[in-house]
Amino acid sequence: MSLLTEVETYVLSIVPSGPLKAEIAQRLEDVFAGKNTDLEALMEWLKTRPILSPLTKGILGFVFTLTVPSERGLQRRRFVQNALNGNGDPNNMDRAVKLYRKLKREITFHGAKEIALSYSAGALASCMGLIYNRMGAVTTEVAFGLVCATCEQIADSQHRSHRQMVTTTNPLIRHENRMVLASTTAKAMEQMAGSSEQAAEAMEVASQTRQMVQAMRAIGTHPSSSAGLKNDLLENLQAYQKRMGVQMQRFK
């Protein structure tokens, strides 16, 4: 796996699923391929994206700044600086300085990542802030190692939280989760279907599902009534794709 592929993988792991994630993935691919060279426009685009947490925006801004060539005097962006200040906690800043001194002696991506993984996400973000604000300089490889370690720490806590929700025995939470998944799957189906004649059927199924979920929420239904909703929808989607000559087995 190449270095940039690894960086893209880690960064995307902390971005919530949805159309925005696909957009960010495309931007990262363009940046890493050298196709997008307007850093200012890229940062303005990132700043106005909804849904993303300030820290995720800060990390993406840091990656874009590392990768896109820019004039020396280009102003640093406040939204990135604020996100990478370790919540203003002096302990984070102290640890960040110690980490920075270690990273300065390191030259490889994997070496930097190994060192960084023993620090908290707050200290890692503060260390990125030091480098972003030009208070410290490390090689691009080392900076990417720091980025990936930070993303791994964040993704780990997201995964633990997600696992707790998926394994919960509370029927009301499970019911709501199934309805949310069915609704987002329906939305994705509508986007994928496009405007061809064959798409009308898929659109109809997706629309009916969304209406059903709205009705279930409006009138309040038994927690078991949502069982299988998402899987029924995915079976319809796969049948539609088969007719269109597309084989996608990875949805379930």
UniProtKB/Swiss-Prot annotation:
Keywords: Host nucleus, Membrane, RNA-binding, Viral matrix protein, Virion. GO terms for cellular component: host cell nucleus; membrane; virion membrane. InterPro entries: Flu_matrix_M1, Flu_matrix_M1_C, Flu_matrix_M1_N, Flu_matrix_M1_N_sub1, Flu_matrix_M1_N_sub2, INFV_M1. It is found in: Virion membrane; Host nucleus. GO terms for molecular function: RNA binding; structural constituent of virion. A motif (Nuclear localization signal) lies at residues 101-105. GO terms for biological process: viral budding from plasma membrane. Residues 165-252 are annotated as: RNP-binding. It comes from the Viruses. Most abundant protein in virion. When expressed alone can form virus-like particles in transfected cells. Plays critical roles in virus replication, from virus entry and uncoating to assembly and budding of the virus particle. M1 binding to ribonucleocapsids (RNPs) in nucleus seems to inhibit viral transcription. Interaction of viral NEP with M1-RNP is thought to promote nuclear export of the complex, which is targeted to the virion assembly site at the apical plasma membrane in polarized epithelial cells. Interactions with NA and HA may bring M1, a non-raft-associated protein, into lipid rafts. Forms a continuous shell on the inner side of the lipid bilayer in virion, where it binds the RNP. Determines the virion's shape: spherical or filamentous. Clinical isolates of influenza are characterized by the presence of significant proportion of filamentous virions, whereas after multiple passage on eggs or cell culture, virions have only spherical morphology. Filamentous virions are thought to be important to infect neighboring cells, and spherical virions more suited to spread through aerosol between hosts organisms. Homodimer and homomultimer. Interacts with NEP. Binds ribonucleocapsid by both interacting with genomic RNA and NP protein. May interact with HA and NA. Cannot bind NP without genomic RNA. Belongs to the influenza viruses Matrix protein M1 family. This is Matrix protein 1. It comes from Influenza A virus (strain A/Malaysia:Malaya/302/1954 H1N1). The gene is M.
